[in-house]
Amino acid sequence: MVTVFTVGHSTRSEEEFVKILKAHGVEVLVDVRSFPGSRRYPQFNRAALSESLAEAGIEYRHEPRLGGRRAPRADSHNTAWRNPQFRGYADHMETEVFRKGVEDLLEVAREARVTVMCAEAVWWRCHRSLIADYLKANGHTVLHILDEKKIEEHPFTPAARIVDGQLSYRGLL
């Protein structure tokens, strides 16, 4: 079993963001944004971020198979999620594409200290929370980086249930 970190870039400066990653010993950053760019914060565009991380000795990888912004299926049974984007992501988590993305993430995490990154500052407002549920349900440790000195171990999201040893977001609807 491995430990995986998560972080949101938020509105931080490039320097502050790199300092936070270095403080937590991050060696590889896995970008799970579906669209790895930012008009407001160009330091987090894929090319700029990759360059600044390389200068700091941190490897950058984009992992679109774990990207967010997924629409729910019409027949979605993940009704514990009221938010349609989270329900859509829960549907995506049931695909081979998602599972292969997680397998590759874990392969990297077995060899290096990895953080999964998206834009949202707090993990509970981001699809990182669902990735974290999946990892935790499969016996891995997930730590959310909040700032340079603060991390939080992932608690399951309120929508998550473990049923017969499997993560489920089935609701009462």
Question: Each predicted region: which residue ranges?
Answer:
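Residues lining hydrophobic/aromatic ligand-binding pockets adjacent to catalytic sites
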Residues: 1-173
